[in-house]
Curated annotation (Swiss-Prot):
Residue ranges annotated as motif NPA 1: 85-87
Main location: membrane
Organism: Medicago truncatula
PANTHER family noted in UniProt: AQUAPORIN TIP1-1, AQUAPORIN-8
The name this protein goes by in its record: Probable aquaporin TIP-type
Transmembrane regions: 22-42, 56-76, 104-124, 138-158, 170-190, 218-238
Length: 250
């Protein structure tokens, strides 16, 4: 069971140069992701003179976030694992794949990366960074469930393509698959919650714009979804014994 593998870690681990380097990698990767993702939204609003939301805007957000996450995960993969997301880090912790203290270093770095990216966007664009919020008519309950489900799909994909020791050559496409699932989920949930799936992505714009309406949804949903995905995949597909089905010649 993964619960046996969950570890707090030691202060020495949290301050070890390798951990600090990994934290810096998470900071840079999250900075890249938020700057490109949120920046694309600001650019679209400028081109449309802050017009009403349109399907084209949703598609552009989906593509921008998918591409940016593909790059962000790729550049951090060999150093920190390329989490770029507190929900991914929490899912890895629940599955016993990262210690609590190392995970805290990651999450702090991710949050700082998002804040710096958001603040820099305000400076270079002279525009506000849109904070995540629920669309009109969307209740807190459905929004929470939507964020849980979308993040479950994201972290499950991370486990299947990047964490599973049996992944084999599929690990090569992990950053692409992770970017694709985020892009697809934005097409699903973007019109309702903004499709965060990532507390860091929501946190930076909230700090810079100082807008906290229903902000807890963007923490609770992703952390619950990520934790469930990590637990399910670790218990059912990594720690359980599995024998390949016999092949039959016809």
């Amino acid at each position: 069971m993964p619960i046996r593998n969950i570890a707090v870690g030691t202060p020495q681990e949290a301050t070890h140069p390798d951990t600090l380097k990994a934290g810096l990698a998470e900071f840079i990767s999250t900075f890249i992701f938020v700057f490109a993702g949120s920046g694309s939204g600001i650019a679209y609003n400028k081109l449309t003179n802050d017009g009403a939301a349109t399907p084209a805007g949703l598609i552009s957000a989906s593509i921008a976030h998918a591409f940016a996450l593909f790059v962000a995960v790729s550049v951090g993969a060999n150093i920190s694992g390329g989490h770029v997301n507190p929900a991914v880090t929490f899912g890895a912790f629940v599955g016993g794949n990262i210690t609590l203290l190392r995970g805290i270093v990651y999450i702090i770095a991710q949050l700082l990366g998002s804040i710096v990216a958001s603040a820099l966007l305000v400076f270079v664009t002279a525009s506000s960074v849109p904070a995540f919020g629920l669309s009109e008519g969307v209740g807190v309950g459905p929004a929470l469930v939507l964020e849980i489900v979308m993040t479950f799909g994201l972290v499950y994909t991370v486990y299947a393509t990047a964490v599973d020791p049996k992944k084999g050559n599929i690990g090569i496409i992990a950053p692409i698959a992770i970017g694709f699932i985020v892009g697809a989920n934005i097409l699903v949930g973007g019109a309702f919650t903004g499709a965060s799936m990532n507390p860091a992505v929501s946190f930076g714009p909230a700090v810079v714009s100082w807008s906290w309406s229903n902000h807890w949804v963007y923490w609770a949903g992703p952390l619950i979804g990520g934790g469930i995905a990590g637990l399910v995949y670790e218990v059912l597909f990594i720690n359980s014994t599995h024998e390949q089905l016999p092949t039959t010649d016809y």
